[in-house]
């Protein structure tokens, strides 16, 4: 599990001011916590963490000498400014199932030469105990052919008895569709209209 250093946040200081000072704000919450704990994380540490981790990742937060095993629940990201604004963490409790998501990563799509691989689902929603959490599902699509599709029920996570799948097993993850050459089709249509 990755470790991320954080500090308890003084709520007197506004989030905008903290961001200007190089921090990302966040909250830690959980069943065994009396109330959520506002935190701040150095912006550089948060950005480095999210180069390899994402929503659904497990992380140990080091907060003033205390280690808390958590799950990344939400990431508020400003895509225009390309910066992380806020992160919510759920404290994990041994023996308690938590709701999470696993990111779907397609592998070898460049090997498919009978069509184009179309990714239709980015993540799978599920419930599991902390020790059974899954961050990423890698799907090898290299052997797929035109007309083939992969559904959630075909993924390894669907066969895992320790995981309660929340996404519909019949949901299509990816399929291979025909390549349409729209420029040629448009030219042919225009030629047909002119001939009429």
Language-model features: locations:
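Acidic, negatively charged sequence tracts
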Residues: 1-196
């Amino acid at each position: 599990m990755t470790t991320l250093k954080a500090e308890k946040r003084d709520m007197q200081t506004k989030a905008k001011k903290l961001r200007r000072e190089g921090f990302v704000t966040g909250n830690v919450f959980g069943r065994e916590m009396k109330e959520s704990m506002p935190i701040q994380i150095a912006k550089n540490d948060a950005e480095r963490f999210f180069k390899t981790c994402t929503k659904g990742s497990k992380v140990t937060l080091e907060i003033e000498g205390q280690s808390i095993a958590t799950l990344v629940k939400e990431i508020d990201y400003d895509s225009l400014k390309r910066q992380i604004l806020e992160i919510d963490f759920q404290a994990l409790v041994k023996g308690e199932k938590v709701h999470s998501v696993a990111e779907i990563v397609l592998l070898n799509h460049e090997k498919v030469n009978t069509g184009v691989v179309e990714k239709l689902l980015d993540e799978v929603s599920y419930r599991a105990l902390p020790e059974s959490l899954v961050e990423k599902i890698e799907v090898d699509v290299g052997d797929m052919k035109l007309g083939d599709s992969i559904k959630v029920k075909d993924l390894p996570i669907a066969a895992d008895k320790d995981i309660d799948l929340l996404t519909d097993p019949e949901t299509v993850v990816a399929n291979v569709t025909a390549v349409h050459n729209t420029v040629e089709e448009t030219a042919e249509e225009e030629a047909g209209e002119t001939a009429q």
